[in-house]
Amino acid sequence: MTTRKYFGTDGIRGRVGQFPITPEFMLKLGWAAGMAFRKMGACRILVGKDTRISGYMFESALEAGLSAAGADVLLLGPMPTPAIAYLTRTFHAEAGIVISASHNPHYDNGIKFFSGQGTKLPDEIEMMIEELLDAPMTVAESENLGKVSRINDAAGRYIEFCKSSVPTSTDFAGLKVVIDCAHGATYKVAPNVFRELGAQVVVLSAQPDGLNINKDCGSTHMEALQAAVVAEHADMGIGFDGDGDRVLMVDHTGTIVDGDELLYIIARDLHERGRLQGGVVGTLMSNLGLELALAEQNIPFVRANVGDRYVIAELLERNWQIGGENSGHIVCFQHATTGDAIIASLQVILALRRSGISLAEARLKLRKCPQILINVRFEGSSVDPVTHPSVQEACARVTEQMAGRGRVLLRKSGTEPLVRVMVEGEDEAQVRAYAEELAKLVAEVCA
């Protein structure tokens, strides 16, 4: 496959003001995308964003580029990433564009695309956009310029879609839930979904100012949510990330329930009701305990590369319906075409209500193995620390010493200049020692 110049594992992402996250590039990207989709005929493109301040700047630039290429533009404003995937389908648009850097701080931003089916763009379309980015920009004749309009009922449409993922008889009366919206794209829609289903809702971090997205809140900083659940005597807490495609939860004791545990709760419920199609897709980072617990239920399990696009690709290839990551990306194909945090959390609550147990009790049904993850920064290094002979040798030695009762995984982040060192096994002290040893070696190789 041709090497991509601009697109990473999940679109294009980086620091605002540094290439390619600049207004000039976004103008050209809008034009290139518009030209690529125009090759299929007249086209409409949806554009949505999260709440970071730079989103307004990039929205305007993309809008101008798309219009210059002759593509019509529908602006959604701040909306969760999965909402943009859904609305792209329902508006029969040729594509959807999301302006977001997901769980990253406000000073980062990025772009990702959805196809007209609400799925990741095919590789050939990405490559066509890449080629056009390096071509001279042209402008359509005046009468052929794209028209731009704003969709004012997008939030209401998506709220109804989320509610449609649960039976019409669903009533969350008696359920008290704390929701942390990360000052992000779910801040309007998520509280309304749960309120309209009858839950008592306490809302945290739903006052976006353009700079506070993901700051000490949401699924990457769960401390405030944990404290609020205990203080409010709530049944559970739900923590979303800035663009609403990942979710972690908190049980009534204030304990975090991660993506592996949430995935297991949903999968087990589907399996017990005879509704599980095939098996479950995890990733290389999924806890060994998840694999073992699913095996006890005779549920097939496979690991994809890290990243929701790889989970989705594996699900499509196997014609399975459910998969996810321990970070909280959970894909329920029976309801949505991509990871959807609100829909995933609704499926967890439904599973708990069917089984009659609390989130705390459900969490304990999955016995996780100790897993230590250490991030090592490597900026400007010409050496690939993952494939370096001394690092490979050390990984092989540690794997041999764990004698089949653990795993070692080294991988480079697709979005940040990090090497992730993960060691997993039965003895936490031993696992930590191995992880620290390998991380130290990786840092030395990078230096």
Curated annotation (Swiss-Prot):
Keywords: Isomerase, Magnesium, Metal-binding, Phosphoprotein. It catalyses: alpha-D-glucosamine 1-phosphate = D-glucosamine 6-phosphate. Mg(2+) binds at residues 102, 241, 243, 245. Activated by phosphorylation. It is an enzyme of class 5 (isomerase). Its EC number is 5.4.2.10. This is Phosphoglucosamine mutase. It comes from Pseudomonas syringae pv. tomato (strain ATCC BAA-871 / DC3000).
